[in-house]
A protein has these predicted regions:
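Structured, hydrophobic secondary-structure cores that serve as assembly/anchoring elements
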Residues: 1-61, 67, 213-357
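A short, well-structured beta->alpha microelement
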Residues: 70-87
Length: 357
C-alpha cells in the first residue's frame, strides 16, 4: 500500500550519506605510456605498478587525504586533450576531479568548463580541483600558492598542478561536519613567504584555495571554491566547499531515490504526493541528527504557486479554488514540491573578549 518502500529507500540513503561524508570519491586524469584506460583504486597498493614514478606519486598523494576510492583514467602519454577521460567520467559519481600533474592552463580551464557543464545538466555534481584558474564558479576549486610558484616537501618542490591530487583527496576525505579550513598538510615543510596576512586574505577573497603558515604548520587558509560573484542562485554561503558538498549530497540522494522508487511506479494522487513528502522529510531529519543541517528547520511541501500555474496552463480555472483544493487537484504526471534546509557551516571565525579583574 502507498509508498512505504520510498521511506525505506530514504532511510538507506541517509546511512550511505554518513559513509560518503567520511570518505568521498576522487577522479584523476593522467597521461602515461602504460596502463591505458580506467582503474578504480581503493589504496596505494592497487596503483598500477607500470606507471611512471611521477604519476604513481601523484596518485599516492590523493590517498593521503583518505578518500573512499580514487578513479583514475590513464590517457596515452601523447594525448592532447581529455576527451576520452570525459567520456569515462560522464556518469561517474565522483566528488572531486583533477587533471594530470603537468596540466596546462588550457586543459585546466577546459576541465573547469566541463565540470560546470556537468553540474548544470544535473546528473552528476563533481567539483574540479585545478591550479591557477580564475573560474568564478562554485564547482571549481582554484588551488594557488600566494607569493610564489612552488611548495616544499623536504628537499622536493612541487607546483600547484602537482599537488591538486593531494587537495582533491583531502577534500574528499573530510566528514561533512567539518570544513577544510585550517586542515593541516603535515608533509609540507615550506610555502612561499608573504609579507602579511592581508595578502592571503585578498587571495581567499579572490576565490583561491591557498596554503597558509599558521606558525605551527602548513594548513589550508580557508575552505573556499572559486565563486566570487554572488547571485540569487549562487549565494554567499556557496563559496564554502563544505556547504556546497552537503547541498550536492542532498540533491543527489533525493533525485536518485525519486527516480529509482517513485517515477513511473505509482499513481500521481494527492495521497502519494504526501507520502513522498513524508519520505523526504524523514531523510532530512536523519541529516539533521548527523549535524549536517540545522534541526527543525527543514521544510518540504507541495508548491501551491507552481501547481496553480500548471493547472491554469491546462485550462483549469483556479479562481475559486483555495490552496488545499489546488494541492489535491489532478496534475497529470507532474509533481510540484518546494522545500528549504539550513546547512550548517563549521566554526571558523571566533571573536573572544576576556575581561580581567
Amino acid at each position: 500500500m502507498g509508498l512505504p518502500d520510498i521511506v525505506i529507500e530514504f532511510t538507506k540513503k541517509a546511512v550511505s550519506t554518513i559513509a560518503v561524508g567520511t570518505g568521498g570519491l576522487v577522479g584523476i586524469i593522467i597521461k602515461d605510456a602504460k596502463s591505458d584506460g580506467s582503474h578504480v583504486l581503493k589504496s596505494v597498493d592497487s596503483i598500477p605498478a607500470d606507471l611512471t614514478a611521477d604519476n604513481k606519486a601523484y596518485i599516492e598523494r590523493a590517498f593521503l587525504g583518505a578518500p573512499k576510492a580514487v578513479h583514475v583514467f590513464v590517457l596515452p602519454a601523447a594525448a592532447e586533450d581529455y576527451t576520452a577521460a570525459y567520456k569515462y567520467f560522464a556518469n561517474k559519481r565522483i566528488n572531486y576531479i583533477c587533471g594530470d600533474p603537468a596540466i596546462t592552463k588550457e586543459l585546466a580551464t577546459n576541465l573547469s568548463t566541463w565540470v560546470k557543464g556537468k553540474r548544470k545538466a544535473g546528473k552528476i555534481h563533481p567539483v574540479a580541483v585545478v591550479p591557477n584558474v580564475v573560474a568564478n564558479d562554485k564547482g571549481t576549486v582554484n588551488f594557488c600558492l600566494v607569493g610564489g610558484e612552488k611548495l616544499s616537501v623536504g628537499d622536493t618542490q612541487y607546483t600547484p598542478a602537482q599537488y591538486c591530487s593531494r587537495i582533491a583527496g583531502l577534500l574528499a576525505g573530510l566528514d561533512l561536519n567539518v570544513s577544510a579550513t585550517y586542515k593541516p598538510l603535515d608533509e609540507v615543510t615550506a610555502i612561499p613567504e608573504v609579507e602579511d596576512d592581508e595578502t592571503v586574505d585578498a587571495a581567499i577573497d579572490a576565490g583561491q584555495l591557498v596554503l597558509y603558515d599558521s606558525g605551527t604548520g602548513i594548513v589550508i587558509g580557508r575552505g573556499v571554491n572559486s565563486l566570487t560573484t554572488v547571485t540569487q542562485e549562487d549565494t554567499e554561503d556557496l563559496k564554502k566547499i563544505k556547504i556546497l558538498a552537503i547541498q550536492d549530497l542532498i540533491t543527489t540522494d533525493i533525485t536518485d531515490t525519486i527516480n529509482k522508487s517513485y517515477v513511473g511506479n505509482y499513481s500521481n494522487s494527492y495521497d502519494n504526493k504526501c507520502l513522498l513528502i513524508t519520505a523526504i522529510k524523514g531523510y532530512l531529519t536523519q541529516l539533521e541528527n548527523k549535524g549536517y543541517i540545522e534541526k527543525d528547520k527543514s521544510v518540504m511541501e507541495i508548491n501551491v504557486e507552481k501547481q496553480r500555474a500548471y493547472l491554469e496552463s491546462t485550462g483549469v480555472d483556479t479562481t475559486e479554488m483555495d490552496d488545499q483544493a489546488v494541492k489535491e487537484a489532478n496534475t497529470g504526471s507532474r509533481v510540484f514540491l518546494k522545500g528549504s534546509v539550513s546547512i550548517l557551516d563549521a566554526i571558523e571565525d571566533v571573536d573572544i573578549v576576556i575581561n580581567k579583574e
